[in-house]
Amino acid sequence: NVEVTATSAGKSATGEEVTMLVISIDGGTLVNGGSYRTLACNEVVDAATVQNGMYEVVWSDTQSAVTPESGQLGALLELRDGTGEDGEYKGVVYYINQLDEYARTLAEAFNEGTASYSGHADGYDSDGDTGICFFSYDGVDSATLKKNSGGYNAITAANISLSYEVQTGVANIAASSSADTTETDNNENILALIDLCDSDEVFGDCSLADYLTSMTATLGTAASYATTQSERHDEILCSVNTR
């Protein structure tokens, strides 16, 4: 959506035709003859979105957003912001969302269990205590994780962590399936957690490893397609320039 319009501005003192260029981006005028506007980059501050900490392009004078759909700038923004939804390119934001979903699903399934497998919170630690989460975010304890209104939605790939209890003592790992502290060799809950990670119940149709494999394959396919398209465009440009 970059538009360039050339109009006649009369003739110079020597009689030569003078052309005035008007260049527009996203419907706004960037250059109009001898005058011009500038663009700026503002940091996005919105903790509720994955764009938090990234930069948006705006008009310097009005601070309104610029969303070019073509050209090098448009391509770079698409590469970064593409969500993969409604035919959009699968950009950085898409893969951040995929990793966030992986982290949340892993944490919830490992902590709470699934239909066929018990979770860490279902097991018992060496003192016979139960209800302890293995994963959390930013190192908070199990109570804080469950009390948070967002619950597991607060977990991202960037902030997933071991819970405070597990970080502060391996004795808090719920290895046993029984509250009986005399069963020192009971590791049934740990074995169930291992089986859970290999099962298809975590994501409903694939295991944790399968999910990552699928995401990596998607990224590889996209990279290969982009490389092929770039080479093809270079060949076309070279052909045009040599005519």
Features from the language model and the residues they span:
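Structural signature of extracellular appendage/secretion-system components
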Residues: 1-243
